[in-house]
Amino acid sequence: MDSPFPKETISADFCVVGGGIAGMTMALECARAGFRVVLMHDRPVPGGNASGECRVQISGADRLGKLPNLRETGILEELRLENCRINPNGSYSVWDMVLWSALETEPNLQVLYNCSCRAAVMAGNRIKTVTGWQTTTQKEITVAAKLFADCSGDAVLAPLTGADFRVGREARGEFGETIGPETADRRTMGMSCIFQTRRCDTPQPFEKPAWAHTYCDDSELPCGADGHANLHEGYWWVELGGECDSIADTEALRPELLKILLGVWDHIKNRGDHGAEHLALEWIQFLPSKRESRRYVGDHILTQRDIEAGGRFPDTVAYGGWTMDDHNPAGFRSAALGEPVNIHHPAPSPYGIPYRCLYSRNLDNLFVGGRCVSVTHAALSSTRVIGTCSTMAQAAGGAAAIALRRGISPREVGQRHLAELQQLLLRRDCYLPGVRLELPELAHARISGTGSTSEALRDGVTRVEGGALHQWRCRPGDQLTVEWDAPQHFRRISLIFESGMQRRIALVPGNPDCLRLPPELAKAYRLEARSEGRWRTLAEVSANARRRAVHPAEAPFDALRLTLLETYGAAETGLHALLAE
């Protein structure tokens, strides 16, 4: 019997399944390169675990701001700075709108919201189409594309396409890891539901629902009395699912997580002196945020040993730096077992992540991103955090653009065009440990400027690194001039500014740095070009909110001049790069 529901087919160059931060970043990078991209997402808002539906803070190599100058840049920095600009009250709905707007305003990108991927059609080892069910329209939507990517978290395309994948913890001996169990198993890190609170002027009573659990003593909780350090955004250790099937058992686990969550809040309010008399529940997470389920197998599987060695790969295209934060599969139950709920195994920051982890080893046109990339369980305990996922996804999005432009496979990008991909990412303000930006446009240019030395603009590093600033330091009124002996024909000029990389700008309750633009960021500046001895203005900016600002350049010129006019409060700032393309 034919379905009574309507069907629609869409053609695209690239189809990304899953619209969390990874899927968004990958889709945007490829779409901005001029290719037609469709993003299929099963929720009404983008952002995944980082959205207002789940509110997981975006962690990464800077370890919640504890390690300066390691914050992820590129598209993620663009999104976070825009949130700083328009969200002075720290609203998660406004953050959702920042993410929505980034997708909505990209002309080459079509987003299918509330559309859950449920089928795929193969032609040998290539995906031809994927099909999703859109709940709001009761429509079956099929997307035909040249390339596909799975950023769904649960790796939904793996069982639909026959792509190789893994589930669970590897045995220690398989890759020489020390974190895993002696014998491989299917246990994973679990999923969590959190809450957020609001401080009120008057005492706020709380009556526990009859169906919620009761916890009379701190010893019944995974972190004991120490687990209540932050009453405003707790708690990640309300976690289950690692001992079950973290996909199939989700709906059975969700009510249990809510019983635990409200039981913990009852304990805080009514069963001990936790300083919560004036706190009220503001928000409860009803959609659990997952850490681990399926993981694809690529041409390389990143391991604990790789991370500990610093990830020194010739095909480094992304980086991480979170500790190997391995969660006990028992989750909340670990307290009853007398076991730690998690262990932070040491990891260097930053460490490189190779391109070979970002595509399927047995399908010819499938990229992977987010927490389902090609890593072991031990390595995933570090790479799973959202900031790290964004760096891998932007790399895959750039690789997709190269593959489409050249008509090649994801694997061939790494085999034949790796340097092109690395330089593309560096020019998009991504950071690759050990890889320097090549600047042929400045090779024969003369650079001069007031303020500190401007020669740092030639060194190919676009952030503070190893104690070196790698920037032209300047104060309002200072000027930088770049001159060539002959007229140059460039299409655009990109400026990469200092953006307070020592700060933590992720949206987190109680974090003042996420409520305003960094004082170090250039607010106002003028960019001019010289032709036939006359200066003309390319851009006069009065309210910049970008670390990477791009300006078109049409007519030929033989000099550029940048004048810093104002910062967002700092006495001085810096310019890391001036790129002419």
Per-region residue spans from a language model:
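Aromatic, loop-rich ligand-recognition surfaces of beta-strand-rich domains
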Residues: 463-537, 543-581
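Conserved hydrophobic helix-helix packing surfaces used for dimerization/oligomerization
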Residues: 14-16, 37, 366
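Conserved N-terminal/central alpha/beta ligand/cofactor-binding core
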Residues: 3-7, 11, 29, 35-36, ...
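Predominantly extracellular/luminal regions of secreted and cell-surface proteins
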Residues: 439-462
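N-terminal Rossmann-fold NAD(P) dinucleotide-binding loop
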Residues: 23
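Short, mixed charged/polar active-site loops
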Residues: 7-9, 138-142, 535
